[in-house]
Amino acid sequence: MEMTKWFDTNYHYLVPEIEETTNPSFSDQLFAQQVLPELDSIKQKFCLIGPVTFLALAKSADSFDKYSIKEELTKAYTDLLKYIENLGYANVQIEEPILGSDLSDQDKSFFSSFYSKLSENLNPATKTHLVTYFGNIEDNIELISSASFESVHLDLITDDSNLKNIENVNCKNISLGIISGRNIWRLNWEKTLER
């Protein structure tokens, strides 16, 4: 697997490769063995990278259409989140940093279909929080507003013009990123709050 930079940071990730034999699915046994022991027993909030970002950043092997696994990926994520819900988590944070980029029509279509299906499958009491970062969401506000979220998080560090997007996001709760994840140790609180 290829390793590349996570957006424009100095962090790296292994690029997922999607091929004809790729069949994403959720395994509660594997999850119970490898992830469950690491989870906080307080069950505050479960966080994960969203499927739109995952698929957008994935690489197609042998010119295979990576978007052909959308339905299987939707089911895998939905099964995982229903499992998390049954563990007692009332808050789910889905991170979609790709929303700060120019999305392809396929990404936009996948976003709409995934979040529509997710809201149909989760208990209405489960609060879904959408987190964006690494860019301006202006081109994707309508898309974001078309889905139902308890809160939407906007990045003010990479692009402070997101501030003007607050009133255009159709969500009752907005959170704002004011601390740079690139250098959290050099934060000057006074200057940050003045901004």
Please give the residue ranges for each predicted region:
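Domain-level signal for soluble alpha/beta catalytic cores
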Residues: 1-195
